[in-house]
């Protein structure tokens, strides 16, 4: 306030007054020194701390971005590996199914061939048995016929009757 009164008493504000300039400069320097001692250090410290905090945040953000990109690359690689693995498993499954199908088909074919062979063998055995039975019957008939021929006289008419009788016996046994 004292300064304001001095300025007003001295005249115009635009007129240079050396005393006023001197005291203004001294006051400015004193305020500057006081601020430097008291406030300048904490203000600069706070600004530096703020700058360090901002730089740290930027560095962390870049680090997080790089880490996220690395994780993304790793996830893509893992996904590609998983897809390749699933393709391999599917391919192996199909190959295994084809192999099993071929084995089952081969086994069924082998079994059917065995069954056909067994059936043929059984048919052949039945055929042999039937032929054996037929031979035995023919032999019996021949023996009976020979027996009848020997018992009967050997004239032609008797022989014809014996043969007709044997044929009749044979036809009755077949039916």
Swiss-Prot record:
Pfam families in the record? ATP-synt_B
- Check the UniProt entry and state the signal peptide residues, or none: none
In its UniProt record, a GO molecular function of this protein is: proton-transporting ATP synthase activity, rotational mechanism
Keywords of the record? ATP synthesis, Cell inner membrane, Cell membrane, CF(0), Hydrogen ion transport, Ion transport, Membrane, Transmembrane, Transmembrane helix, Transport
Keyword field contains Transmembrane: yes
Record membrane topology: Single-pass membrane protein
One GO cellular component term noted in the UniProt record for this chain = plasma membrane
What role does this protein play?
F(1)F(0) ATP synthase produces ATP from ADP in the presence of a proton or sodium gradient. F-type ATPases consist of two structural domains, F(1) containing the extramembraneous catalytic core and F(0) containing the membrane proton channel, linked together by a central stalk and a peripheral stalk. During catalysis, ATP synthesis in the catalytic domain of F(1) is coupled via a rotary mechanism of the central stalk subunits to proton translocation. Component of the F(0) channel, it forms part of the peripheral stalk, linking F(1) to F(0).
Its recorded name reads ATP synthase subunit b
